[in-house]
Amino acid sequence: MTAIIDIAAREILDSRGNPTVEVDVTLEDGSHGRAAVPSGASTGAHEAVELRDGDKSRYGGKGVLKAIENVNRDIFEALSGLEAEDQGRIDEIMISLDGTPNKSKLGANAILGVSLAVAKAAADASALPLYRYVGGVQAHVLPVPMMNIINGGVHADNPIDFQEFMILPVGAPSIAEAVRWGSEVFQLLKSSLKKAGHNTNVGDEGGFAPNLPSAEAALDFCVQAIEAAGFKPGVDIFLGLDCAATEFFKDGAYVYSGEGVTRSPEEQANYLAKLSASYPIASIEDGMSEDDWAGWKAVTELIGSKIQLVGDDLFVTNVTRLEEGIKKGIANSILVKVNQIGSLTETLAAVDMAQRAGYTAVMSHRSGETEDSTIADLAVATNCGQIKTGSLARSDRTAKYNQLIRIEEELGSQARYAGLKALKALA
């Protein structure tokens, strides 16, 4: 009944107006699944490869017709007739068909689109929501949202070197209330930025992108907005950073071009420690560059027992790199992006490895998103307790928050909001 009878891919647009892959999977019983693949701006060197056409006459070379052809021809031929419920086998077949260590032949965007659409079709056939199909009866934890309210780095055209300044409403009683808290802080931040003479244009992920001189200035505005909304910084709402340090790591040093400052790895670790001591920061992502393992070790030893240190470019949702980090005692959390590794099975394996090692896991979007809300379901399915999906603006971001609100409503009395316990270093 769940045999795959059709797989069809198409080229659609993401939130930046760039093409991406969308896949439909149809089963023998008429069940259907659809998934759209996100795309990153600051990408780790060790990520699975997003296959682009390179034809400058279409979308400036960013077209995905090759990936679509791979889905409609090679992948469909390999999967036709297989049972959609056998997710592990299906993903394994696609990975073997690709045959490269980074999915560069078929494209991670091709493989992932099919992988997620297959899971959705199987869930449809089972008459279950995706979070329940993937996570089973234990899937009931609603994640703390890491809401990106100020953008910098490659996500914005401003002098701020850090990529994201986030709020984490850990004290809220529910995801619906957490979204309300975040929205109220977001709107008050907009007002305070305007009063201070800053523009309130938004970046790729919906956060404001003001011309602020430093990370400290951005953090000050965040704290003021939290207080103006009637919440207590460091109690009701914490702060989070995504430094995206790989983007400004040059010749062994961290070059803050916006501030005109250069820091050695040791100075970078000390700077992050200083920030975390001065502000109610609960989480720092990619505070060191992806291959600066010594720097990561230093910052972990310095503040890893106090706050969450998230590896994004460091781990790229890859169990091999995560295993190495665990063995070396580096970071204490992994950012989970389905398109970094390129299949649902491998994504779930990364979350499982992290949780078994006592690391936290944060389900995450990409800066180039679509209206697809799969990651909201996956956050609940894995009970990971945290989700990073942008600001309180742009429908490509709010689609995920809205889906979480629906899931919470559907779970009813079974629903549990993760709260402060999601951040083990602080709980």
Swiss-Prot record:
<dbReference type="InterPro" id="IPR020811">
    <property type="entry name" value="Enolase_N"/>
</dbReference>
<feature type="binding site">
    <location>
        <position position="242"/>
    </location>
    <ligand>
        <name>Mg(2+)</name>
    </ligand>
</feature>
<dbReference type="GO" id="GO:0000287">
    <property type="term" value="F:magnesium ion binding"/>
</dbReference>
<dbReference type="GO" id="GO:0009986">
    <property type="term" value="C:cell surface"/>
</dbReference>
<dbReference type="GO" id="GO:0005576">
    <property type="term" value="C:extracellular region"/>
</dbReference>
<dbReference type="InterPro" id="IPR020809">
    <property type="entry name" value="Enolase_CS"/>
</dbReference>
<keyword id="KW-0456">Lyase</keyword>
<keyword id="KW-0964">Secreted</keyword>
<feature type="binding site">
    <location>
        <position position="366"/>
    </location>
    <ligand>
        <name>(2R)-2-phosphoglycerate</name>
    </ligand>
</feature>
<feature type="active site" description="Proton acceptor">
    <location>
        <position position="337"/>
    </location>
</feature>
<feature type="binding site">
    <location>
        <position position="367"/>
    </location>
    <ligand>
        <name>(2R)-2-phosphoglycerate</name>
    </ligand>
</feature>
<dbReference type="InterPro" id="IPR029017">
    <property type="entry name" value="Enolase-like_N"/>
</dbReference>
<comment type="function">
    <text>Catalyzes the reversible conversion of 2-phosphoglycerate (2-PG) into phosphoenolpyruvate (PEP). It is essential for the degradation of carbohydrates via glycolysis.</text>
</comment>
<dbReference type="InterPro" id="IPR036849">
    <property type="entry name" value="Enolase-like_C_sf"/>
</dbReference>
<feature type="binding site">
    <location>
        <position position="337"/>
    </location>
    <ligand>
        <name>(2R)-2-phosphoglycerate</name>
    </ligand>
</feature>
<keyword id="KW-0479">Metal-binding</keyword>
<comment type="similarity">
    <text>Belongs to the enolase family.</text>
</comment>
<dbReference type="GO" id="GO:0000015">
    <property type="term" value="C:phosphopyruvate hydratase complex"/>
</dbReference>
<comment type="pathway">
    <text>Carbohydrate degradation; glycolysis; pyruvate from D-glyceraldehyde 3-phosphate: step 4/5.</text>
</comment>
<dbReference type="InterPro" id="IPR000941">
    <property type="entry name" value="Enolase"/>
</dbReference>
<dbReference type="Pfam" id="PF03952">
    <property type="entry name" value="Enolase_N"/>
</dbReference>
<keyword id="KW-0460">Magnesium</keyword>
<feature type="binding site">
    <location>
        <position position="388"/>
    </location>
    <ligand>
        <name>(2R)-2-phosphoglycerate</name>
    </ligand>
</feature>
<keyword id="KW-0963">Cytoplasm</keyword>
<protein>
    <recommendedName>
        <fullName>Enolase</fullName>
        <ecNumber>4.2.1.11</ecNumber>
    </recommendedName>
</protein>
<feature type="active site" description="Proton donor">
    <location>
        <position position="205"/>
    </location>
</feature>
<dbReference type="GO" id="GO:0006096">
    <property type="term" value="P:glycolytic process"/>
</dbReference>
<keyword id="KW-0324">Glycolysis</keyword>
<feature type="binding site">
    <location>
        <position position="163"/>
    </location>
    <ligand>
        <name>(2R)-2-phosphoglycerate</name>
    </ligand>
</feature>
<dbReference type="GO" id="GO:0004634">
    <property type="term" value="F:phosphopyruvate hydratase activity"/>
</dbReference>
<feature type="binding site">
    <location>
        <position position="285"/>
    </location>
    <ligand>
        <name>Mg(2+)</name>
    </ligand>
</feature>
<dbReference type="InterPro" id="IPR020810">
    <property type="entry name" value="Enolase_C"/>
</dbReference>
<feature type="binding site">
    <location>
        <position position="312"/>
    </location>
    <ligand>
        <name>Mg(2+)</name>
    </ligand>
</feature>
<dbReference type="Pfam" id="PF00113">
    <property type="entry name" value="Enolase_C"/>
</dbReference>
